[in-house]
Amino acid sequence: MHLISYKHFVPNSLNLENLFDSLQNVAWTSHGPIELDDIDKRILLSRKNNESLEIKSVDKFPCLTDYIIPPSVRIGDASRVRLGAYLSEGTTVMHEGFVNFNAGTLGPAMIEGRISAGVVVGRNSDLGGGCSTMGTLSGGNEVKVSIGENCLLGANSGLGIPLGDNCTIEAGLYITAGSKITTYNSNNEPESVVKASELSGCNNLLFIRNSQSGAIEAKINPKSVALNKTLHKN
């Protein structure tokens, strides 16, 4: 995890198979990691000695910032970024953002949503508040989700396919691999209905839900995301 967070290796480049089987749950505290069999005694001892012992979490992974402070990165709530997160310079993780291990950003990015394990986000992309990306830790999902450069995931949206560059998903729209999507040509005319998985990695797409029919539509994206540079001068 240190090698990834120090950015010696990008996410998904190391063999992490059976990692969870090899790690134990540990109490991560202000005095460092403590085995769960010892935590009750340590709590009593700290009270006896009038010492402060803060238990930050009980988990297999500590918070990133307990061990590594990435350069030129802003993190609103350090408890929401695990060790093993890969955060590039210029990344801002707001208070509701979350970054799992073996996941992260490949350039400046605004993170107000969830980056699940195995997910990477391209340069100058924006994950809106409450949005979600599907990881590979549970649920049988073997597709590694990625987000290209200059993309926007609207608030409370979701993504279950790899997204190309310059793509936008409207707020509240969750796209899974099996979602049926109507594609439109450059004349804004409907062409065909395809599974979202067939659009994996395609660039310059705008994903919206038709407010009258409820159908999911993919059109040519007329805009490109531009991050507020002031917010990313970390």
Features from the language model and the residues they span:
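Terminal amphipathic alpha-helical/low-complexity segments used for targeting or macromolecular assembly
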Residues: 1-66, 198-234
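Alpha-helix boundary/capping detector
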Residues: 27, 123, 177-179, 195, ...
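A mid-sequence, solvent-exposed acidic-amphipathic segment
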Residues: 65-68, 80
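A structural motif detector for beta-strand N-caps
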Residues: 73, 79-81, 85-87, 91-93, ...
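C-terminal amphipathic alpha-helical segment
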Residues: 130-202, 209, 214-217
